Amino acid sequence: MNAVPDGRSDKPRSVVGVLALQGDTREHLAALTEAGAEAVTVRRLRELEAVDALVIPGGESTAMSHLLREFELLEPLRARLAEGMPAYGSCAGMILLATEILDAGAAGREATPLKGIDMSVRRNAFGRQVDSFEGDIPFVGLDSSVHAVFIRAPWVERIGDGVEVLARADGHIVAVRQGRMLATAFHPEVTGDRRVHKLFVDMVSE
């Protein structure tokens, strides 16, 4: 691991990258820092190789897939996930972490699955941006509900063995965990509640 010493304790802080090709990178960097990680941006292969874990932010999943290819990160990222690198994806990040993407986009510009979590995810399942919504939902492992902000959000339609459902909204799966990989259909990085990011940072250290 590339963990760095934490000046507040003897426990090293995990170095968590945020994929910074497109999407709400800055909000995740702030949330991870407040959750106790050493947060850095990832745009190049050498930066991907230097982190202990990766956050794939919200944004546009087809654009992010295109940029992963352009920056020659798609296959190296798939390889690191297959090797067990912890990862957290929010919204578009959840879509990309799936093994199967439903309604993946127009031919030639599809969102490409990274195959990190054994699940099938439907893009924009809750509707267009004008149909975005928010609300409080129970979240397994947290002591109270989280305020979830959904923006053109996906939902999970299938999970494989070993995938734990952490939250649902309107009967649909919107948060899952498999091993040291986490995914949410909503955006905890925009609310000021750092518990989901703290959960992930703790997972990285497991």
UniProtKB/Swiss-Prot annotation:
Q: Which residues form a coiled coil?
A: none
Q: Which GO terms describe its cellular component?
A: cytosol; glutaminase complex
**Substrates-to-products reaction catalysed:** aldehydo-D-ribose 5-phosphate + D-glyceraldehyde 3-phosphate + L-glutamine = pyridoxal 5'-phosphate + L-glutamate + phosphate + 3 H2O + H(+); L-glutamine + H2O = L-glutamate + NH4(+)
**Pathway listed:** Cofactor biosynthesis; pyridoxal 5'-phosphate biosynthesis
Signal peptide as annotated in the record: none
GO MF annotation, one:
glutaminase activity
Look up keyword Lyase and say if it applies.
yes
Q: Which parts of the sequence bind L-glutamine?
A: 59-61, 123, 151-152
According to its UniProt entry, the protein's GO biological process terms are:
glutamine catabolic process; pyridoxal phosphate biosynthetic process; pyridoxine metabolic process
Q: What is its EC number?
A: 4.3.3.6, 3.5.1.2
Note the superkingdom of the native organism. Answer: Bacteria
Q: Which residues form the active site?
A: 91, 187, 189
Provide this UniProt record's keywords sorted from A to Z: Glutamine amidotransferase, Hydrolase, Lyase, Pyridoxal phosphate
UniProt xrefs under Gene3D superfamilies: 3.40.50.880
- Quick check: keyword Lyase in the entry? yes
Quaternary organization:
In the presence of PdxS, forms a dodecamer of heterodimers. Only shows activity in the heterodimer.
Belongs to which family?
Belongs to the glutaminase PdxT/SNO family.
* Function in brief: Catalyzes the hydrolysis of glutamine to glutamate and ammonia as part of the biosynthesis of pyridoxal 5'-phosphate. The resulting ammonia molecule is channeled to the active site of PdxS.
Q: What is this protein called?
A: Pyridoxal 5'-phosphate synthase subunit PdxT
Q: Which organism is it from?
A: Mycobacterium sp. (strain JLS)
